[in-house]
């Protein structure tokens, strides 16, 4: 039975749908949509952020080996200092995708070029069917124009590069099974062989930064160079195919990584994990406690102007606290003050997220109320992470066998 559910409601004659994801009861079974479907096991992950990291966590959770990796990470949120200027502007800190074996030792990665796949297999369909037979998931860039579920009913389509996980196929019905964010919800969907080939072949013939994902500020002349730099990085992304497979390594908690990320959170720095992207954009990003300050500025500005609030950072904050609770349970932390603050932070972050969902519909005046809650939450977050850092240093880092 699927523990996730869809909540439907209406306001002033307009219907809305919210997909609610519950943690902790992912099934390890292979779901069978039809008898002719061949697929790798996969489930909706606890945290649905950027498609690559959602895919990684979904693979680990469906094989029941995710908890150690989950609590070792998801500790350092970051955001662009110019919120919403690009679709990917807020997330948790991870290492480079190409070096996943370093920061997620449970998975192996093989990187193939599209030229190699064309030469070796001819058809991408044949290539991905072969990879699936080897128990390897394929992470690819594709043109979402050809995927129906990516768009709302009646929405104008345009070429748009996105990323998905290829995890199954059905020769009888003639479709591939992929996982991605479809209409704002991370899930699996089917795409016909014909449309899959079109989406695969035209992945880079797209508008890389579509106007619908930008704020008005992004059109200012002062941001032209900034956006051009990001667009150049985006154009270069996606030619390679990443093949992910589970290995035989045992799950382990990385206490040093956790400690380093807590220190970065407290200091608003990025010294534990290095990536080319963060080096190139280091003056444009905020981390940890500074992330919370930056998001407050964004929140206050949106409410003052009564504009739509992007909920991504508040989802990240809510999941930050959700994972913190899991972390406390696995580490068997019994500091009652810490646990009480953690529960309060999770409650605050959930309340803020759901209140802002309603605000985007009603545009009601909640500015003072929400900002007060957000400020209280920020204070709690700093206290919780500082205490976690102290606990890690006192109880775990002193033991070299861990």
Regions found by a protein language model. Name each.
Residues 17, 163, 188-190:
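Well-ordered beta-strand positions in beta-sheet-rich domains
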Residues 13, 171-315:
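Noncatalytic regulatory segments and standalone regulatory/sensor domains
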Residues 245-402:
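Charged low-complexity "KEKE/polyampholyte" interaction tracts
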Residues 63-89, 120-173, 180, 392:
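Active-site-adjacent substructure of cysteine-protease-like catalytic cores
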Residues 96-145, 234-235, 242-248, 253-260:
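Predominantly the structural core of cysteine protease catalytic domains
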Residues 14-19, 23-24, 28-122, 223, ...:
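Cysteine-nucleophile protease catalytic domains, especially the papain-like/related folds used
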């Amino acid at each position: 039975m699927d523990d996730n559910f869809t909540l439907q409601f209406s306001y002033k004659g307009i219907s809305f749908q919210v997909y609610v994801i519950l943690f902790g009861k992912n099934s390890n079974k292979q779901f069978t949509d039809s008898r002719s479907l061949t697929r790798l096991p996969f489930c909706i992950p606890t945290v649905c952020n950027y498609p690559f990291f959602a895919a990684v966590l979904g693979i680990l959770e469906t094989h029941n080996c995710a908890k150690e990796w989950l609590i070792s990470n998801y500790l350092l949120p970051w955001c662009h200092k110019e919120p919403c200027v690009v679709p990917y502007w807020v997330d948790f800190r991870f290492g480079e995708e190409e070096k996943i074996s370093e920061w997620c030792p449970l998975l192996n990665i093989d990187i193939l070029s599209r030229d190699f796949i064309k030469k070796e297999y001819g058809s991408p369909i044949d290539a991905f069917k072969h990879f699936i037979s080897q128990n390897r998931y394929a992470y690819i860039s594709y043109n979402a124009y050809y995927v129906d579920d990516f768009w709302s009913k009646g929405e104008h389509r345009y070429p748009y590069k996105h990323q998905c996980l290829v995890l199954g196929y059905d020769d009888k019905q003639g479709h591939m099974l992929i996982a991605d964010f479809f209409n704002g919800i991370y899930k699996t969907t089917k795409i016909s062989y014909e449309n899959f080939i079109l989406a695969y072949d035209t992945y880079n013939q797209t508008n890389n930064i579509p106007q619908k994902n930008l704020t008005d500020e992004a059109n200012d002349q002062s941001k032209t160079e900034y956006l051009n730099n990001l667009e150049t990085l985006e154009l270069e992304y996606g030619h390679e195919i990443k093949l992910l497979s589970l290995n035989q390594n045992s799950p382990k908690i990385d206490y040093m990584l956790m400690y380093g990320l807590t220190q970065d959170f407290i200091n608003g720095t990025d010294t534990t994990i290095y990536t080319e992207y963060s080096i190139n954009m280091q003056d444009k990003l905020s981390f940890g406690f500074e992330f919370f300050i930056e998001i407050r500025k964004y929140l206050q500005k949106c409410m003052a102007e009564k504009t739509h609030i992007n909920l991504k950072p508040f989802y990240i904050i809510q999941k930050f606290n959700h994972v913190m609770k899991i972390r406390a349970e696995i580490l068997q932390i019994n500091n009652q003050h810490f646990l009480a603050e953690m529960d309060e932070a999770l409650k605050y972050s959930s309340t803020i997220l759901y209140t802002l969902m309603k605000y985007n519909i009603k545009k009601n005046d909640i500015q003072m109320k929400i900002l007060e809650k957000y400020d209280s939450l920020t204070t709690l977050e700093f206290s919780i992470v500082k205490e976690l850092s102290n606990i890690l240093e006192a109880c775990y880092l002193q033991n070299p066998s861990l």
